[in-house]
Structures are given as structure tokens and as C-alpha cells.
Amino acid sequence: MKKNTFWISSAPRTGSMWLFNVTREILKISGSDVLPKKIPQWDEEMLELYEKQAMYDQNELNKYVLKLHTILNPDLPRSKILSTIRDPRDICISFLEFMKTDFQTALKSTKSIIKYSNTYNEYDKDYLKIIKYENIENKSIETVLEIAKFINCEIDYNLAKQISEKFNKDNVKKIINKNNNNL
């Protein structure tokens, strides 16, 4: 049975939103109907969508990209997992800077990366792909190509470059600022 669900399962502040957006974009460009259209905001909603819809969807064009901050089982039907990993010091700083948390909360959240790393390092490499945050920043085109290969989509270097540019930090900041101004 073909894979129709691609999970983005990572500790917070590790590049998971970039990975989510890039995975969706690769699938769209490849001709898939990317679901869900309206993105659930909670892990429980993502899991419910999978259990009630994605697992039973027989339309081969439909591909689900579901993002959560939960460690998943090593054998989810019709699924593959993409995860991100980042230097724990950078995660802690990111929490303090962008989430405006206190140090203890940031440190506690940072420690979750150890659980992800210890668990996911045991999973089959055909089922799980780990993306390093520094590659998102420094080798984004190659990383886009890596993701495409893992999710069985063929894209060329130029398309990977377009996707990389679309989701680079500066362009994402512009989109966020534009959306904030429209509120």
C-alpha cells in the first residue's frame, strides 16, 4: 500500500514549520492534492484526522502532511516521518527569544530533543528521515532535494531552488508581516 501521510514530528523550535511548508510545496508541485486544506492547530486534531480520514483515503492523489510535537510509533500504516534536529543551545535561545519564556521553561522544552533523538535514531531509515536544522539554513536546496527523494517526488535543482527561496527566513518574515498588517 502506498504512503499517503507524511508526518512532521519534531521538538519545537527545530525547523519543523519550514519542513512542513516545504513538504507540502513539493507534493503540490508534484501534482498531489495536499491535505488538510485547513490546518489543525493541535496534535490531537492531527492524530484524529489521520485516524478518521487519511488512513482510509484510497485516492492516490491525496497526500496528507501532518505536523505535531509528539513522538510517533515506528509502524504507522501508510506513513513516513520527517523530523528535525537542532543544537540544544540554539533551541533554548530560540525559546527565550521568540517564545518569550523564562529560562526554566526554555530548558525543559529543549530537553525534549533528547527524547526525539534517542527514539527516532532506532527507527528504520526508509520510514523516518531526520533533517538537521543547520542544513535548512546552509544547504537548503540540497535539503529540499533530500526531502523530495524521501517522499518519492522527483523535482529538479531549479524547482528545489525556487522552493528554497520561497521559504527562506526573509521571505517568510515578509509574508508574516504582510499578514499581520492585513489583520
Model regions: which residues?
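PAPS-dependent sulfotransferase catalytic core
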Residues: M1-V65
